[in-house]
């Protein structure tokens, strides 16, 4: 593509350098002829006029040949044979034998060059550069494709259209609209350098710099790249997209958006395969979910999305260094999996969930959602819940498993199941009316239930099956009883904003 552009430029420069080089006179034959009485240097020719000049043969009904200027003016049924493959048809012509420039007019001037055709009302053809020009609408065809523009050029030496102003390239499968286009007919590739839209039955491609292979339907975009495909959008700096396979690779500022499900997956590199119903993004990858007016940001080293046969979101998977931010809850883990069918988000390998002033950890955490928000949270194996109540004092609940129940997105109560342990501080109203720590309940039991008030604070703890409980004044609680085994306080790693999901 670049080589052909250089060739066009060199041919143009050669044309400038060689203007006026030819002094060979035009030769002609005709059925009848006479000198113009007012201009004896001009011959008026009639009937079967044939003129030749340096490899070109011209046919016309009549003509005027100016021997002083070495120019030829022809009329009606004009045929110009420029080479074995290149022919021009028209109704009126002026040819300068010194500059080798043809100007030809007709209701429709037709240039045929092998399988390429150019039509216009007026063409200027420079023989030195093998280039035809038009400046008032032209219509080209090459194979099964048509090219239309207000102005343009066609180079018959290298078989290239250069067209601009209201450009349209189309065939039975697509329509390309732009302002400036170079179309190399040998490889059927369109090269564009301005805002370009490519429409087809299945997709829309937008680019401001790139190439489009009209035969294979493969697009290469290097600036402001955008593809839309049935509710699926891709934006990036650089994009390679195969329309037939519905497969794309994107580089730089990548955004893959599922408009049907209101999900955007972003990163620095991504791939999407619509026929196989998956996409993935890596390098600063993150997903934005918009639901019920709130947004959830999920980051992982690599994020995968899949859809079902009805183009509905099926799964989201994030691997390594996963963090999640939502206004009312945050999380961290090694990997995460979201099943859209069941609305379940599962966090694996050392997961942490923060909800308001609570921190929950477990081997695996499942968050079940409905239209109102979180419905139930399962803390599977090694459940541990912590709430900070003072600078160095924490409410703690620990057990084999835990379940937190919600209603309308608000927490109701939580069950700590099997081997439940507790450190729970008692508060009372202080002299200034603010809560004051007065004691601590410490104990173990088979199961425990914690109830939450309207402010989401733990208001009551119920123990079952003959628990072993002790109450201490706050200042007398032994140091070794203030922390349950495996205590961790991870507030420093909690994401406080969407940007924090990238901090590990």
List each language-model region with its residue ranges:
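Bacterial Sec-dependent N-terminal signal peptides
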Residues: 1-27
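N-terminal amphipathic/hydrophobic interface segments
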Residues: 18-504
């Amino acid at each position: 593509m670049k080589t052909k552009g250089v060739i066009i430029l060199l041919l143009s420069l050669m044309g400038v350098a060689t203007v006026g080089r030819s002094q060979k006179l035009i030769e002609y034959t005709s059925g009848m002829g006479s000198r113009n009485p007012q201009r004896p240097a001009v011959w008026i020719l009639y009937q079967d006029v044939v003129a030749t000049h340096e490899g070109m043969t011209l046919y016309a009904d009549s003509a005027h040949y100016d021997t002083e200027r070495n120019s030829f003016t022809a009329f009606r049924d004009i045929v110009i044979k420029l080479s074995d493959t290149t022919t021009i048809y028209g109704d009126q012509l002026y040819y300068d034998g010194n500059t080798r420039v043809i100007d030809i007019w007709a209701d429709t001037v037709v240039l045929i060059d092998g399988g390429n055709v150019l039509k216009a009302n007026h063409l200027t053809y420079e023989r030195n550069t093998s280039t035809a020009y038009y400046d008032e609408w032209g219509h080209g065809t090459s194979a099964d494709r048509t090219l239309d523009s207000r102005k343009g050029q066609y180079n018959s030496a290298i078989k290239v259209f250069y067209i601009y102003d209201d450009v349209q390239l189309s065939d039975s499968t697509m329509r390309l609209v732009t302002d400036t286009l170079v179309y190399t007919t040998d490889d059927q590739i369109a090269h564009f350098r301005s805002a370009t839209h490519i429409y087809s039955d299945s997709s829309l491609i937008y680019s401001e710099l790139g190439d489009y292979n009209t035969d294979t339907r493969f697009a290469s975009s290097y600036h402001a790249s955008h593809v839309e495909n049935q509710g699926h959008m891709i934006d990036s700096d650089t994009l390679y997209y195969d329309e037939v396979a519905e497969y794309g690779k994107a580089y730089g500022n990548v955004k893959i958006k599922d408009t049907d499900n209101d999900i955007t997956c972003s990163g620095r590199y991504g791939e999407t395969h619509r026929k196989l119903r998956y996409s993935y993004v890596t390098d600063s990858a993150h997903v934005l979910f918009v639901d019920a007016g709130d947004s959830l940001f999920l980051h992982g080293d690599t994020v995968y999305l899949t859809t079902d046969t009805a183009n509905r979101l099926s799964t989201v998977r994030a691997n390594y260094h996963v963090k999640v931010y939502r206004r009312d809850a945050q999380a961290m883990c090694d990997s995460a999996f979201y099943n859209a069918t069941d609305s379940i988000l599962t966090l694996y390998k050392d997961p942490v969930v923060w909800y308001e002033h609570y921190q929950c950890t477990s081997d695996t955490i499942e968050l079940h959602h409905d239209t109102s928000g979180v419905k139930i949270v399962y803390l599977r194996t090694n459940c541990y819940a912590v709430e900070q109540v003072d600078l160095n004092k924490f409410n703690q609940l620990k057990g084999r498993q835990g379940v937190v129940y919600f209603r309308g997105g608000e927490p109701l109560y939580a069950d700590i199941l099997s081997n439940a342990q507790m450190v729970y501080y008692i508060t009372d109203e202080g002299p200034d009316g603010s809560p004051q720590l007065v004691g601590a309940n410490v104990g173990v039991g088979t199961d425990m239930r914690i109830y939450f008030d309207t402010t989401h604070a733990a208001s009551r703890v119920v123990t079952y099956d003959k628990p072993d409980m002790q109450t201490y004044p706050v200042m007398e609680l032994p140091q070794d009883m203030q922390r349950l085994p495996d205590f961790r306080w991870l507030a420093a790693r909690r994401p406080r904003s969407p940007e924090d999901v990238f901090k590990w």
